[in-house]
Structures are given as C-alpha cells and as structure tokens.
C-alpha cells in the first residue's frame, strides 16, 4: 500500500497552550466570540442532531443552545463539545454536539454555556469523498452561564454495547447513502456511534489493535474476542465483517504537556479513557480523550522464521516503504536485520518500493544502484550474504507511488545458493514472453516486465519476472506491487456498502498476471512459478479470485491458521495485503508471514514480510 502523508493534527498544540490535566481551566487566548451571562433557548441539542446523520436544522441559525462543556480541542479543528444534561428518551438522538470556533476556545470543561450560531454538516475532504458528515455549530457566539459543573455521566462502551451488525444497507433511492435513514443504534454499530456523536463516552481496559502513530493516535477494539489474531489484534475477515468494535483514540491534552503513549498491538489501554465521541477525517469514529488511560504492555515481540534447509528454496517478499538514499542509515540497518535475522537470509527476496537514487527529488533519475548498494551492504554488515540484484529501471514518473521516487520491484538473490538466468533485452516498455527451451518454459527476457503496455499497469508498478535455477531446477518468480486502495470509500462511508473503485484496476492487473502464468503452464504444465508481493488486496477479494482463476495459482496464505493471516494493519484492522501464490507444480511448501512491523509503533516498514520454502 502507498502511504498517504498528512499534517499532524496536533502540531499546533505542541507547546502552544497551557491546559490542566483535565482541561479544567479556561484557555486565556483571543477568541472570535465573547463570554457573557445568558439563559437557555428553546431548541435543544437532540433537536439539532435529529434521528438521522444529517441535522433537520442544517443551514439554520440557532439561538442559546444550552449544554455543559465536556471537551476542549485547542489544536487542529479547534472548538469544544457540549452536552445537554437533560436527555430526551430517544436513543437515536445524540445529546452532544461540536462547536467549531476556528480558534482556541475560551471555555473550560464543566462550563455551562449557551451557544448561538449556524448548524452545519462538515464533510472531511468534501462531500464527494463519501465520508459521513459531522454535525456542528459554526460561527458561534458563546455565553458562559456557570463553571465547575458536574459533567453528564459517560455512556460506557463495551463488548455488549456494540451491535454485531455493522451498518444498514444504503437507500437505493439516495444513491446507496445511509445518511438520511433513521438511526437504529440497537441494531447497527455505525448507527450506535452516530447516535452518540459529540457525547461523553467511556471505555475501560481496551485491547489495542493498532499501534500508536506519529499523529498521536492508536486504535482499540471493544470486542477483543471478535476475529482475534494470535497476537492480540483484530483481523479483517470479510467485507461483511469489518469489526464494529474498533475505535480510534486521541488525546485532547497537548503532547507538550502530556506525551502521547507509545503502544503496540497486543497492549491494553488500561483503566478508564473518557471524552467526547468525534468523527475523524483519517479513520471514522474517534474518542477524543479528556482522560486517557495507561498503556499496559502485552509483551508482543517481533517474530523470527526458521531457516531453510539445504534442499529448500526460500523466496521472500518485502515492501520496504519507499527506500531511498536519503533515508538515514538506521532504516537500512533495520530492514537489513529483518532480512538476515527475522527472515533467516532467504535465497531470493522480491522487494517492493525501492526508489531511485535521488529518492523523492523529481530530477529525472531512474536508476536505483545507490539505493540497492546501500541496502545490500547493510545486509552484509548484519551478517547476511552478499546479495546480487536484478531489476528494470522504470520510465520516469510512469509507475505511480511517491512523486519523483520511481518505485519499482527488484530481486535480491544469494548467488551462493541460487543462480539467475540472464536473458538480455528487457527494459521498461518491452514485454517478456514465454518460449520452450529443452522442454522447459523459459522467459524471452530475464529480468523482464510482464505486459507493460497493458493499460492495467498505467501509473502502477509493472510486474518483474525473473528466471532462477536452484540445484539445477528452473523456477520462475514474478514480483508484484498492484495499485493502491487510494480513492476507495472508507468503511465509515455514508455509502453502504462502500465503493471500492480502485479494485477495477487491480482486477485487470490480476487478470494480466494470471494470463502470463497460463502462458507459462501451456508451455510446461508442471513449471514451478512463484507470484508474490504487495497485491494490495485481501485474500477474500475479487483480485485474489482473478489471480487464482482456472487453478493456475493458489494463495499460500490459506495454509496459515486464520488468526495468523495479516501483513498490514489499517485503522486497527489486521489484514492481508501481501500475498504469495504458487503454480500447481509446487505441490508442497511451508509459508510464513513474519510479523515484525505492522503491530509495532517503531517500524522499519509498514508491511510485514512473507516467505515461502519449498523443494523444487
């Protein structure tokens, strides 16, 4: 997957404000609104929120809406939350709402206030992106009635509180949208969260399923027994089962005052975490913690796979996340340690996201010899073999990824264990094909690109095919990095089920690779072919179905227990993005996903490597 960059939502808060641990003191800063004494108006928060995702009062001016301040955010989307301490009897109508001030608010937690302003529905990234909107009061005038009030009791969210069903089907008459459907919080998890939008909620002793990040956030699950991984995470098992208990957690306290904790998958966010329930641009529903629990280590450690024996060929794949010469040496060393110590120095390593020698500088450079020399030197320094490499430089700016980086697939191989069969003529635009030589399938160009002129590979990495020989037996390896999921609607989308628009291109890519493997097997029925890399799609996806169509390939991930099937964690969901597939000529194999990155806050890459061992 291609990582998306974003500014730190808390950067403005670092060292900028003085806030008590409970945010109990008023922020003494300039604000566009004034604080004066006033009484409540007739319209209540639950009236504004209504029983759907869109306020029945959107666009209207509201006057003297009363509530108790339950949280203050002085960074990012600045404002505060208020909650009516006198709820109605409708569980579908939230009693809380966010007041967007666009400046550090001059209110404190526990203040009783009245707010006048405009009711708006804010769509992060714009309405066209498909996300659910956040109901808020904008351009406010705020009056403080009293201070030091008791907060409304939090709604406790636990395993029993979360419905098993994730979301309703969208309304066909509304383009598949759910935003105008009446909320059913007792039936659907997304409806439950929507019905609590802006309200004070509490979780206790929550299992951490997504490690803390540079953006001061982590993911927990309120249902740790649902789709549990073997190492304390939550596995994305199917499109119909996206794990409704997942919740993102951030802190409202600036990190300069209270550093955000470091957490790994398998840890626990111990004690109570409490604050308003928000909707986040980068991950759905979010507990904006006024009170943050303590991380209790779970003891998760990076895995190590076994070494191959003398007669086994070990082939690995590793997405090294935009590796380039501008990276510090520590990244090269950590990735090298992963290859040597955690993967036990495989015979062949298919690398994804090797950048060119100028990295993200867009200067026309396409060679990657400097990048690969530094990496292979680091492997030797870590005690590994002196790997040789093969690859094909891409056309400048034609293969997607980070602008200027020209990422590509590359083979490393240990010449003391395996030989590479070089057949010249392969370049960025020339397709390799299959011929018969001495009764065996052979590539016309090795290394060579698979079907590079096919529009399926536009702005995407072209597959790299190479022919190897191990103990006299030829093996064809195809390294892949399919297009990313960028542009897909999120699991929290107001369109349910969400549209996976990026899948169209991956399907075409899978069909292209499948057709190439068919060509190999037509020439040699028992040819030994390994297709591997960052497929950017799940084991239950249509992409995997297209790769394996006709029985020409089978995905090795299914040889693992279900609770071990993941190479990447996104929004707290452990999932398969990287796969290894083999042709029928490889009858027995030993496959492993080596969890050394995805579960940890301190990562060498955002993907876990995978390895397959077999006897050709």
Regions found by a protein language model. Give the residues of each.
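A broad structural signal for short, well-ordered beta-strand segments within beta-sheet-rich domains
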Residues: 31-33, 137, 208, 420-421, ...
């Amino acid at each position: 997957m291609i990582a998306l960059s974003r500014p730190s939502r808390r950067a403005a808060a670092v060292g900028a404000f003085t806030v008590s641990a409970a945010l109990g003191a008023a922020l003494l800063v300039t604000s566009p609104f004034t604080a004066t004494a006033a009484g409540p108006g007739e319209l209540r928060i639950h009236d504004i929120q209504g029983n759907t995702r869109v306020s029945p009062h959107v666009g209207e001016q509201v006057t003297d809406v009363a509530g108790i301040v339950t949280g203050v955010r002085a960074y990012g989307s600045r404002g505060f939350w208020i909650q009516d301490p006198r709820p109605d009897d409708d569980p579908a109508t939230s009693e809380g709402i966010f007041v967007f001030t666009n400046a550090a608010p001059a209110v404190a937690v526990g203040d009783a206030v009245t707010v006048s302003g405009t009711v708006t529905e804010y769509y992060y990234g714009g309405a066209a992106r498909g996300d659910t909107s956040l109901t808020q009061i904008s351009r406010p005038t705020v009056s403080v009635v009293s201070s030091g009030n008791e907060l409304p009791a939090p709604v406790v969210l636990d395993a029993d509180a979360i419905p098993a069903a994730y979301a309703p089907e969208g309304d066909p008459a509304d383009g598949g949208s759910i935003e105008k459907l009446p909320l059913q919080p007792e039936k659907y998890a997304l409806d439950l969260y929507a019905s609590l939008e802006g309200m004070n909620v509490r979780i206790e002793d929550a299992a951490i399923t997504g490690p803390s990040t540079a953006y001061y956030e982590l993911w927990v699950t309120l249902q740790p027994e649902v789709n549990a991984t073997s190492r304390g995470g939550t596995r994305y098992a199917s499109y119909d089962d996206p794990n409704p208990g997942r919740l993102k957690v951030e802190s409202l306290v600036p990190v300069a005052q209270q550093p955000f904790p470091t957490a790994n998958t398998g840890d626990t966010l111990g004690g109570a975490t409490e604050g308003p329930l928000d909707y986040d641009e980068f991950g759905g529903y979010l507990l904006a913690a006024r009170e943050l629990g303590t991380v209790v280590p779970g003891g998760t450690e990076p895995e190590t796979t076994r070494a191959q024996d003398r007669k086994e060929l070990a082939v690995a794949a590793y997405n090294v996340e935009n590796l380039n010469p501008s990276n510090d040496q520590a990244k090269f060393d950590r990735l090298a340690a992963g290859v040597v110590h955690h993967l036990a120095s495989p015979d062949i390593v298919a690398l994804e996201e090797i950048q060119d020698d100028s990295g993200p500088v867009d200067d026309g450079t396409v060679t990657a010899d400097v990048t690969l020399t530094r990496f292979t030197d680091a492997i030797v320094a870590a005690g590994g073999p002196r790997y040789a490499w093969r690859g094909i430089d891409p056309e400048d700016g034609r293969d997607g990824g980070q602008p200027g980086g020209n990422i590509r697939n590359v083979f490393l191989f240990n010449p003391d264990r395996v030989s590479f069969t070089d057949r010249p003529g392969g370049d960025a635009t020339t397709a390799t094909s299959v011929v018969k030589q001495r009764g065996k399938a052979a590539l016309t160009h090795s290394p060579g690109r698979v079907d590079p002129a096919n529009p399926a590979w536009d702005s995407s990495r072209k597959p790299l095919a190479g022919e190897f020989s191990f103990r006299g037996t030829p093996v064809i390896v195809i390294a892949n990095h399919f297009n990313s999921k960028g542009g897909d609607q999120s699991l929290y989308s107001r369109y349910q089920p969400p549209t996976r628009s990026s899948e169209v291109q991956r399907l075409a890519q899978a069909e292209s690779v499948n057709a190439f493997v068919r060509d190999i097997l037509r020439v040699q029925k028992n040819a030994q072919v390994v297709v591997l890399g960052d497929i950017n799609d799940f084991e239950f996806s249509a992409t995997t179905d297209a790769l394996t169509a006709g029985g020409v390939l089978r995905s090795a991930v299914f040889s693992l227990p279900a609770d071990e099937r993941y190479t990447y964690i996104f929004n707290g969901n452990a999932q398969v993005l990287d796969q290894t597939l083999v042709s029928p000529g490889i009858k027995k194999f030993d496959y492993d996903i080596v969890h050394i990155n995805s579960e940890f806050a301190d990562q060498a890459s955002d993907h876990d490597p995978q390895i397959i061992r077999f006897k050709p």
